[in-house]
């Protein structure tokens, strides 16, 4: 059933399926306590250091996961010859570009970690540099920022040892200035009980965890703001796991909610009780 969904669903749903698979591995590999002093080294988001071997073992065991793996590598090869993402707005949104960047950087970074073929890391780096040089990520529609920060954070974290110091600096500055700094303390999504809360909080959390050692005070504020405001989104699942926005937005919001929780667990340990929220 899973492989059917992956092979025949739309690209964004394919990405969500992969994210759920890797979120599962982060649960298996996570530490045991929420303590900033015990922040894991890079890579710390979802697939931690050495986690590739667990994925490879599963690929060798389960044919459905092998097909997903092969599909990602095939799409990564196709990305290598495609034009770089451009900052082209659709009405008031940049969301399509953010999602394209997330898919490309995520797939390419995964392909590099699983194969060690430099062509994937090189192209992922070029994608990250390209969007890092955008003037902004359209903070007036903050979903665009949330997904773009997630894209850059995964690439920065997963390719950390590959990236040149200058490249790290450019990408890190973009995550901070166009992501973390773009979120005002009173942003409305912090008060929302909808997919916006999970998506925007999730993206910002990934950014904070990715660059934590360079801006610890700022990162802690983002993390703690997330822990304070994210339960509003979890309450929307009550009383029986339904979702007031319907099944489509249930899938969108829940995928980012799972990613949010998995990032806390893979980077720090427990998730501060988010996964135990009564209605979630």
Label each PLM-derived region with a short phrase.
Residues 26-30:
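N-terminal signal peptide c-region/cleavage motif recognized by signal peptidases
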Residues 41:
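Beta-rich carbohydrate-recognition and catalytic domains
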Residues 13-16, 45:
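Positively charged, low-complexity intrinsically disordered regions
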Residues 17-22:
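Sec-dependent signal peptide hydrophobic core
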Residues 1-14:
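N-terminal secretory signal peptides that target proteins for export/translocation
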Residues 44-59, 65-280:
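Aromatic-lined, polymer-binding surfaces characteristic
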Residues 32-38:
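Cleaved targeting-peptide boundary
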């Amino acid at each position: 059933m899973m492989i059917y969904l992956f092979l025949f669903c739309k690209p964004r749903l394919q990405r969500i399926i992969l994210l759920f698979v890797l979120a599962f591995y982060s649960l298996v590999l996570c530490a045991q306590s929420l303590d900033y002093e015990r922040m894991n080294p890079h890579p710390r988001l979802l697939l931690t250091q050495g986690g590739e071997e667990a994925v490879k073992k599963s690929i060798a065991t389960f044919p459905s996961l092998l097909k997903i793996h092969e599909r990602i590598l095939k799409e990564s090869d196709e990305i290598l010859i495609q034009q770089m993402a451009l900052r082209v707005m659709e009405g008031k949104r940049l969301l399509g570009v953010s999602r394209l960047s997330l898919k490309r950087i995520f797939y390419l970074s995964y392909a590099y970690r699983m194969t060690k073929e430099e062509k994937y890391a090189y192209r992922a780096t070029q994608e990250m540099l390209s969007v890092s040089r955008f003037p902004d990520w359209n903070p007036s529609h903050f979903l665009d920022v949330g997904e773009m920060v997630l894209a850059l954070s995964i690439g920065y974290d997963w390719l950390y040892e590959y990236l040149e110091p200058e490249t790290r600096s450019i990408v890190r500055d973009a995550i901070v200035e166009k992501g973390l700094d773009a979120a005002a303390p009173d942003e409305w999504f912090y008060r929302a009980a909808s997919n916006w809360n999970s998506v925007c909080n999730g993206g910002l959390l990934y950014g904070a965890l990715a660059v934590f050692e360079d801006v610890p005070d700022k990162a802690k504020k983002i993390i703690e703001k997330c822990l304070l405001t994210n339960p509003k989104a979890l309450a929307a699942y009550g009383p029986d796991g339904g979702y007031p926005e319907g099944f489509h937005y249930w899938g969108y919001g829940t995928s980012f909610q799972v990613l949010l929780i998995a990032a806390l667990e893979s980077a720090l340990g427990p998730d501060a009780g988010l996964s135990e929220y009564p209605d979630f």
